[in-house]
Amino acid sequence: MTLFTENDLLNNSYKSIQKSYHFSENQAAKNILEQAYKNYDKNKIYDIFLSHSFLDARKILGLKNYIEGLGYSVYVDWIEDKQLDRSKVSKETAGILRERMQSCKSLFFAISENSDHSLWMPWELGYFDGIKQKVAILPVLKSSYDDSYNGQEYLGLYPYVAKGTIINSTQEEIWIHSSQKQYVRFRNWLQQN
């Protein structure tokens, strides 16, 4: 198993953009996001609320595509709720995000070099942990050689996300680690109390 790397996520993002080869890269990305926005259903239950820094938008698009390719549904605020103003903290935005988190089974906290610049990530983590306790840290690293991760400060309290194949199979899966040697498939973790 390995952790997620920036290059893997950017390549995955590029692959989805490349499918719209007759558009420029920016136009293709915009078309993909607009299609996702049109398909948004406020009554839908998502497997994952993806908490992240907007500065990582391209990587997050790649991560969303990867996870959805495994059969899970992912809520990303700037895709599903383009009207939200993320540049400042407001009661209106907080209210909408609370509703969306209520519609999600878990929260993945995508930590990167840009996470410190997010106004919303710490609040999303605390709120979701308080209502559902299904929170996992998803490290986005420059490089990854294994599946070990030690979160700093309060992030070390939560399990973390890695990717890998199922034993005796080529099928990819998301794994939730409580330590490097203790882990469970994401779908099984969702069903645990």
UniProtKB/Swiss-Prot annotation:
Its EC number is 3.2.2.-. It catalyses: NAD(+) = 3'cADPR + nicotinamide + H(+). This is Probable 3' cyclic ADP-D-ribose synthase ThsB'. It comes from Bacillus cereus (strain MSX-D12). TIR-like domain-containing component of the Thoeris antiviral defense system, composed of ThsA and ThsB and ThsB'. In the presence of NAD(+) produces a signaling molecule that activates cognate ThsA (AC J8G6Z1) to hydrolyze NAD(+). The signaling molecule is a cyclic ADP-D-ribose isomer and may be 3' cyclic ADP-D-ribose (3'cADPR); it is not 2'cADPR. The keyword NAD applies. Homodimer. Keywords: Hydrolase, NAD. It comes from the Bacteria. The keyword Nucleus does not apply. InterPro entries: Toll_tir_struct_dom_sf (IPR035897). It is an enzyme of class 3 (hydrolase). GO terms for molecular function: hydrolase activity.
